[in-house]
Amino acid sequence: MLQLQPSAVATTIQQGGVIAYPTEAVFGLGCDPDNDSAIEKLLVVKQRPWQKGLILVASSFEQLLPYLDITQLTEQQLQFAQSKWPGPFTFVMPIQSHVSKLLCGEFDSIAVRVSAHPVVRELCDTLNKPLVSTSANLAGEQPVVDAQHIITDFSDKIDALILGKLGEQRQPSTIIDARSGQILRNGS
């Protein structure tokens, strides 16, 4: 497992690799959202059922647009989401019909966040697209907040680890349904 800087990991991601990287609150596992093989590998590493869906993180709302059907959202709903970004708010938004079921699971929507974390932003800027994101832990276990645990638990399962500091958040992001405004999970 390579330990690299964000810009050096872009090739690993583009080649279908799964990486671990710091986020606002915990270490995340990520891959290319347009590569079903990479998503399948990530789901196996995490031992997460595909039906649950995943999150996309981005450095800008524009990076998320190819995946979202914003025609199902009002201008006010879009403005509300954008007023919370970048930051620790994840919004569940309707997807375009071409989006892989591996990303959205059994849903007609996907969770998306525009991150304020510098590593996530640099990764997404380098890739010029969002990144699949899920907490670095096995399904049902506590998320990892220490790079050493990534090395211990995932070194033979992932392709790269980006070393870096976690953000200041101690709780996962708040999740809001963009259509209804309902808070699905209280977080930071």
Swiss-Prot record:
Q: Which superkingdom is the protein from?
A: Bacteria
What this protein is called in its record is Threonylcarbamoyl-AMP synthase
What lineage is on file? Bacteria, Pseudomonadati, Pseudomonadota, Gammaproteobacteria, Alteromonadales
EC category: transferase
Q: Name one GO cellular component term.
A: cytoplasm
Q: Which UniProt keywords apply?
A: ATP-binding, Cytoplasm, Nucleotide-binding, Nucleotidyltransferase, Transferase, tRNA processing
* Gene3D superfamilies linked: DHBP synthase
Q: Where in the cell is it found?
A: Cytoplasm
Does this UniProt record's set of keywords contain Transferase?
Answer: yes
One GO term (biological process) = regulation of translational fidelity
Reported function: Required for the formation of a threonylcarbamoyl group on adenosine at position 37 (t(6)A37) in tRNAs that read codons beginning with adenine. Catalyzes the conversion of L-threonine, HCO(3)(-)/CO(2) and ATP to give threonylcarbamoyl-AMP (TC-AMP) as the acyladenylate intermediate, with the release of diphosphate.
Q: What are the protein's GO molecular function terms? A: ATP binding; double-stranded RNA binding; L-threonylcarbamoyladenylate synthase; tRNA binding
Known InterPro entries for this protein?
Answer: DHBP_synth_RibB-like_a/b_dom (IPR017945), Sua5-like_dom (IPR006070), TC-AMP_synthase (IPR023535), TC-AMP_synthase_SUA5 (IPR050156)
Q: What catalytic reaction does the record list? A: L-threonine + hydrogencarbonate + ATP = L-threonylcarbamoyladenylate + diphosphate + H2O
Q: What is its EC number?
A: 2.7.7.87
YrdC-like domain residues: 3-188
Q: Which family is annotated?
A: Belongs to the SUA5 family. TsaC subfamily.
- Report the NCBIfam families cross-referenced here: L-threonylcarbamoyladenylate synthase
Among its keywords, does the record have Membrane? no
